[in-house]
Curated annotation (Swiss-Prot):
Domain UvrD-like helicase C-terminal: residue ranges: 524-810
Name of the protein in question: ATP-dependent helicase/nuclease subunit A
Cofactor: Mg(2+)
Lineage: Bacteria, Bacillati, Bacillota, Bacilli, Lactobacillales
One term of GO molecular function: ATP binding
A single Gene Ontology CC term: DNA helicase complex
EC number per UniProt: 3.1.-.-, 5.6.2.4
Protein's job: The heterodimer acts as both an ATP-dependent DNA helicase and an ATP-dependent, dual-direction single-stranded exonuclease. Recognizes the chi site generating a DNA molecule suitable for the initiation of homologous recombination. The AddA nuclease domain is required for chi fragment generation; this subunit has the helicase and 3' -> 5' nuclease activities.
Organism: Streptococcus pyogenes serotype M12 (strain MGAS2096)
Gene name in the database record: addA
GO BP terms: double-strand break repair via homologous recombination
Length: 1222
């Protein structure tokens, strides 16, 4: 009953219907079954909507209407007197919460319209009004409410903010880490700590690897119920437990013995084959058969009598015995067919090899792990203290605060438990243990309603644990008093062609070992309506593979993304769908595994005129041109003496100074000053007091005056106004916001600039003030190699969608293409130097010194990286968890399709057969095979091969190059909307039509030649942008002989009294010296001094050259000696020119440069380049100049038709010469 007040102020009593009993629910199910409704609710849906009074876990397969069930259940609760504000409803995303709220709102409006009872109308209207304040949202949002309201109980201010920007978090983390690292390096246990750092970083100076370890441990701990307790009690769990052979888990031993027995059984099956050849011609046993029988008997005996023959203590001996018994190869060949009998056993033996040695040294790493535990605990506390001081927290902090409030305050916890009639959770399979703890605290123990599908758990990278769902599933099935499991199997989304192929694939692929759930009848998809079962032969699933048999090896590898040929296959199929079946582009979606390296898809689709909307890529907001210009503008306003920022601002479209202008300004220095910044030179140029005032002409003087006046006004405004207003003042004063509107990707550029102003505003609202602080924050973000989130702009609606599988979850599309099926799963995590596990804690690779073990006496140490027992244990679990999630990703991708699913990949047709022997397998692919295969494509091909006698509901087709010609792919048929010859259609005069035609022609011409407009005729390698290089196509190249050089370098005269030696002058002098140095003579100081006299440089530069370093290069390095040995093959300072083609306009331009040195042999070339840059690590220069050397190599190869086999950088900017092979 519920009391409301009527218009006279009198109480109105509303009598609500009671909740349905199990018998009433069965009666309702029967009525629904017998009804003549076109769309009936299933019996399981009815059970999930109306069952009450206990915990309920709804396992909802893809497309089974779980959102419909949740909305109907919520509405039923409301109609039975449960106010909407007494329901806790958790969703995985804010978007899902908004959609759910809208659906409930529509249902309430509909119910109000249908209800004739005035009292019920008033009640439902109140529910509608309360909907906005109801607890429908993410767990993060709810935790914020709890902390805002009760944070005082644990000492947390209600006036906190959320640090959503990872860059801001990293800046704070870096500050805390650096301070803590210094403290630990100076503590009593510093030697142990240094050993810890060296174990992961190699040396104490480079802390990046150790820092990453600490950050990962911290982040992992935050997903647990209580990070501090986990770090104290679980972090070293495996390290403490697994120290002897006897500590190895029984499960691992069982798997080894099972592999041994399976090997014996498979070998017996092979020996029983008719063509095996058990007997010789004489009728006696063949030697091969005798050997195999011995293996079978011994393996079976050792498995049966393991405990008495070996036991855990003798495990190392068993491994040696088995290794010595079986052959080193994997296969047994019968009639030219290879059977991988021993493959699985070899993999298991590898896991257990060298156990005694590992355990001997493993104990030495325990003190290191204790130091790591102390450091991570200290880091967690210090980082939290900084966040408390700033009153800025991460989402995980807020959730832990909420948990702490509920755990430590019984009255608060009970008030929530009494308030909520039911605790409802959507996407339950993606919860982590922290969220599970919060839900447990809110529930009274028997009022939880959880909806999810373990087959769609794909957020392990967010520490989601599908075992939470799995454990509930098992517990509720075994102990019905704890809760009830309801299965929603009917799919209302997809046609039978999609459902059948999904069932066929996963019934052969997914079980508890890989996938975390057995894909049996209770998990298989069933069509929810008759219309879905109508067959369409042309919608049968397709596995389309580009045949790579003729691949020249230049195509991208799996790690580099999808190939051009694969994208062309997709384009061909889309053109066919669009032209032949009239399928609109928006009905087609491409699914990829990651957001990166998808540019080739957009590029290829543009070629074929197929519109596409992408899901974005890597974050490059701060690196966009328009944002970089604005940041340099702000840096200049803050400090005009920052030459780099000032030059960028002057060269920007806002002021448009060119190279000649800057050169004239640069000469206006003060002769009495050694160091003179560009800003001072500008001021002197304006008043005519520079060293060369005659170079400043009237036009340049006018530009300088405008610049100084504008900069002065900006600097004055920066002291008075907000950052937001300053940025808009810059936009308006120099029309920069309008300017970018005329450039390519105008909408994106304007959105980026607008976002910069908003972010500056948000920055100041966060408590930080001033231009200096904002610039410092941005620079720290860039220093930590982070970026800010990209800005989204409105996308066209009639276009093909490209998105990640993760992004597609919860969505549906008529036609789905799953791309890059040949891409290998990322196994990076299982090869790291450490692996974390919630139960076992950390396992590490230990860098052990085995000098004593080897009896080595000459070397100081012999270091070997060992996988400790905890590491091996975590590694095996992580590998299976990774494969399981990849399997679930494939399930999510396939079940997005409504009508048809395509798989796109690349494989060698000649090598794709013979995956395994099909005759001895059950329903599933063998576990060893599923573990071994590491791509979607391999799984599908294995299923197609092994179960070839079944109808698997998908076809495998190899696509040849001949199928991908322009004629074969075809062109889009685009209907002409207006007939240009029909004036009734056009409704415009001839004059206007001609004008529009002319404008269109000019626009097209500019578009075609845009790159040519902006590209100069001649460029140098250092000027060529790295991002543009892959698009350019070399068509001609020539190495210019030294005698053909017609232009000599022109050097401006020195007007100053004292010449400053620039780094570039030293570099030029070194190159000249290396060019004239006579290599036929011994290289010593005298030889170098003689050569030095021949070069064209002033005495200050010659004095600055480090001749000892040059002598050391020739005398102490193998490359220097190579110069002298093969001097007849050496060419020095060779100019080159490459003719390049702009990919858009097809305009040609010349790229020129000079190659420092190369050796030309009969069959190959060796390339050498000298660098005088200062550096900390050689890898910095290697990355910086890699593309430049690739360009030089390209020039040499084009000229001589020989490969460049070696490329060297000679680094002269350090303490001694270093040689780096690129």
């Amino acid at each position: 009953m519920l009391f409301n007040i009527n218009e006279k102020g009198e109480p109105l009593v509303i009598s609500f219907a009671p909740f349905l009993s199990p018998e009433a629910i069965k009666h309702l199910q029967e009525n629904e079954r017998c009804s003549d409704q076109s769309q009936k609710r299933t019996a399981q849906q009815i059970e999930a909507i109306y069952t009450s009074g206990q915990n309920i876990l709804v396992s909802a397969s893809a497309g089974s209407g779980k959102t419909f069930v949740m909305v109907e259940r919520i509405l039923d609760k409301i109609l039975r007197g449960v106010s909407i504000d007494r329901l806790f409803i958790s969703t995985f995303t804010v978007k899902a919460a908004t959609e759910l709220r809208e659906r409930i709102e529509n249902k309430l409006y509909s119910q109000i319209a249908q209800t004739t009872d005035f009292q019920m109308k008033v009640y439902l209207t109140e529910q509608l009004q309360s909907l906005g304040q109801a607890d429908i949202g993410t767990m993060d949002a709810f935790a914020q409410k709890v902390v805002s309201r009760y944070g005082y109980s644990i000492g947390i201010s209600s006036q906190f903010r959320i640090m959503q920007d990872k860059a801001e978090q990293d800046v704070l983390k870096q500050e805390v880490f650096s301070k803590l690292f210094s403290e630990f390096m100076n503590q009593k246990e510093a030697p142990v700590f240094r050993a810890l750092v060296k174990n992961f970083s190699g040396n104490c100076k480079d802390t990046s690897a150790f820092r990453e370890l600490v950050y990962t441990c911290y982040s992992f701990s935050q997903s647990t119920e209580n990070p501090k307790i986990w770090l104290q009690e679980n972090f070293l769990s495996a390290a403490k437990t697994y120290q002897r052979l006897e500590d190895i888990p029984d499960h691992d031993i069982e798997l080894l013995l099972l592999a041994m027995q399976d090997t014996a059984n498979q070998l017996r099956d092979v020996t029983d084959m008719e063509d095996y050849g058990q007997l010789t011609k004489a009728g006696s046993r063949s030697a091969k058969y005798t050997k195999h029988l011995t293996i079978i008997e011994k393996l079976s005996d050792w498995v049966r009598d393991f405990k008495c023959l070996y036991g855990k203590a003798g495990l190392d001996r068993l491994i040696r015995d088995v290794t010595g018994l079986i052959p080193s190869g994997n296969d047994v060949t019968v009639s030219k067919v290879k059977y991988p009998v021993f493959k699985t056993l070899h993999q298991k033996l590898k896991q257990f090899r060298h156990l005694e040695t590992i355990l001997m040294y493993q104990k030495d790493c325990f003190p290191l792990l204790e130091q790591l535990q102390d450091f991570v605990l200290a880091f967690s506390e210090a980082y939290l203290a900084v966040k408390i001081q700033e009153s800025a927290f991460e989402f995980s902090d807020i959730t832990h605060f909420a948990i702490k409030i509920l755990e430590e305050n019984t009255d608060i916890r009970q008030s929530y438990q009494q308030h909520y009639h039911e605790v409802m959770v959507d996407e339950y399979q993606d919860n982590n243990h922290m969220q599970e703890r919060l839900l447990t605290l809110l529930s009274n123990g028997h009022n939880r309603f959880m909806v999810g599908d373990i087959k769609q758990s794909i957020y392990r990278f967010r520490q989601a644990d599908p075992q939470i769902f799995n454990q509930k599933f098992r517990d509720y099935q075994k102990k019905t008093e704890q809760g009830k499991v309801i299965l929603l199997k009917e799919n209302f989304r997809s046609q039978s062609e999609v459902l059948n192929v999904s069932n066929a694939v996963f019934s052969h692929l997914m079980d508890e070992s890989v996938g975390d759930v057995l894909y049996d009848e209770q998990h298989q998809l069933i069509a929810g309506s008759h219309a879905q079962t109508v067959p369409y032969l042309d919608r049968r699933a397709q596995l389309l593979l580009y045949n790579s048999d003729k691949d020249d090896g230049n195509a991208p590898s799996d790690s580099e993304g999808i190939s051009f040929s694969e994208v062309t296959i997709v384009a061909k199929e889309i053109i066919k769908l669009h032209n032949d079946k009239g399928v609109p582009f928006e009905d087609i979606t491409l699914l990829v595994s990651s957001r990166t390296r998808n540019d080739i898809i957009s590029h290829t689709f543009n070629q074929y005129g197929i519109p596409i909307v992408t899901d974005g890529g890597q974050q490059n907001y701060l690196k966009s041109v328009e944002v970089m210009v604005m940041l340099d503008t702000l840096r200049t306003i803050n400090n005009p003496r920052n030459d780099y920022a000032l030059v960028a601002l002057l060269r920007s479209p806002m002021f448009a100074f060119d190279e000649d202008d800057l050169a004239r300004i640069a000469l206006q220095k003060d002769n009495e000053l050694d160091k003179d910044c560009l800003y001072d030179k500008i001021q002197r140029a304006v008043i005519g007091r520079g060293a060369h005032p005659e170079l400043i002409h009237d036009t340049l003087l006018g530009k300088l005056n405008i610049f100084l006046k504008t900069l002065k006004s900006w600097r004055r405004y920066a002291k008075l106004g907000s950052l937001y207003d300053l940025i808009w003042k810059i936009f308006n004063d120099r029309f920069y916001f309008d300017f970018v509107a005329s450039q390519a990707k105008a909408e994106q550029a304007q959105a980026n600039l607008y976002a910069l102003a908003l972010r500056a505003n948000q920055f100041e609202k966060s408590g930080y003030k001033g231009l200096y602080c904002f610039i410092k924050m941005i620079d720290k973000v860039l220093e930590t190699q982070n970026d800010l989130a990209d800005v989204e702009v409105a996308a066209p609606k009639q276009a093909v969608n490209l998105m990640t599988i993760h992004k597609s979850k919860g969505l549906q599309f008529p036609y789905v293409f799953i791309l890059n099926c040949d891409k290998r799963f990322s196994m990076t995590d299982i090869h790291k130097s450490f692996i974390l596990n919630r139960q076992h804690g950390i396992g590490i690779k230990y860098l052990a010194d085995i000098k004593v073990l080897l009896g080595e006496t000459t070397l100081n140490s012999v270091k070997v990286s060992m996988e400790t027992l905890p590491y091996q244990l975590n590694k095996q679990e992580l590998r299976l968890a990774t494969l399981s999630e990849q399997m679930r990703l494939l399930y999510v991708a396939m079940t997005r399709a409504e009508k048809k699913v395509y798989f796109i990949g690349k494989a060698s047709k000649s090598k794709s057969q013979d995956i395994t022997d099909p005759k001895k397998l059950g329903k599933l692919l063998p576990l060893a095979l599923r573990e071994q295969l590491l791509t979607f494509q391999d799984w599908l091909l294995a299923i197609a091969d092994v179960f070839s006698t079944e109808d698997l509901y998908f076809d495998v087709r190899f696509i040849e190059d001949s199928d991908l010609t322009q004629e074969s792919v075809g062109r889009l048929q685009t209907p002409q909307l207006l007939n240009p010859d029909d004036l009734k259609d056009n409704r415009q005069s001839e004059t206007i039509a001609r004008a529009l035609d002319m404008l269109e022609a000019v626009s097209q011409l500019n578009a075609n030649y845009e790159a040519a407009i902006h590209l100069p005729t001649v460029r140098t390698p250092s000027q060529l942008k790295a991002a543009y290089e892959p698009l350019l196509e070399p068509i001609g190249v020539d190495i210019i002989e030294k005698s053909s050089r017609s232009l000599s370098d022109f050097t401006l005269p020195h007007f100053s009294k004292k010449v400053k030696v620039e780094a570039s002058h030293i570099g030029s002098a070194l190159h000249q010296l290396m060019q004239v140095l006579p290599l036929s003579k011994p290289i010593n100081q005298q030889t170098l001094l003689d050569a030095l006299r021949e070069i064209d440089s002033n005495e200050e530069v010659k004095t600055a050259l480090d001749l000892k370093k040059i002598e050391s290069f020739f005398c102490d390095t193998s490359l220097g000696q190579f110069f002298q040995t093969y001097q007849k093959h050496l060419y020095r300072e060779a100019p080159f020119a490459i003719l390049k083609v702009d990919p858009i306009s097809q305009e040609e331009y010349v790229l020129r440069g000079i190659i420092d040195a190369y050796f030309l042999f009969d069959d190959h070339i060796v390339l050498v380049d000298y660098k005088t840059d200062k550096y900390k690590q050689p890898i910095e220069l290697k990355k910086r100049y890699q593309q430049q050397l690739e360009l030089y190599a390209e020039a040499l190869t084009q000229t001589y038709k020989l490969p460049v086999t070696k490329r060297y950088l000679v680094l002269m900017g350090g303490g001694k010469p270093e040689i780096v092979e690129v």
